[in-house]
Amino acid sequence: MATLPPEIIAAAREAERKWRIPASISLAQWAVESGWGRHMPPGSNNPFGIKARPGDPFVTVRTREQDRDGHDYFIETAFRKFGSIAEAFDAHGALLNKPVYARARAALPDPDRFADALTGVYATDRGYGKALRAVMHGSNFCQYDGAAA
């Protein structure tokens, strides 16, 4: 089990308190999306792969995506640039509170069902929920849930 930097745990717990998204979900997405913090778009402070909207500060990166049939393809993508990791966790919580993620939120308080409901919505990878669950349980991230209580 990897040791998490204290600022990552604190950011996930604060996002849970504010947005009611389990810290275990945020931590698993941080680990999966950024390779445990090692593979963020350079200069972005964006461990979640959050894409930039018009007017957002951004960095451009070539990414691998997956179509509905499971075939990989590559695109140039503008990722949002954040001032800090804590700001990224806050934006991640806000993002998961958008209507497109209502089905995932309806699965709460079960983080496993929430993770599965993100497949095909948050990420194109058909094994996304399974990957999140493996990280959540393999790293005991559920121990950090409960900041919202």
Give residue spans per PLM region.
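Catalytic cores of secreted/periplasmic lytic hydrolases that degrade extracellular macromolecules
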Residues: M1-A149
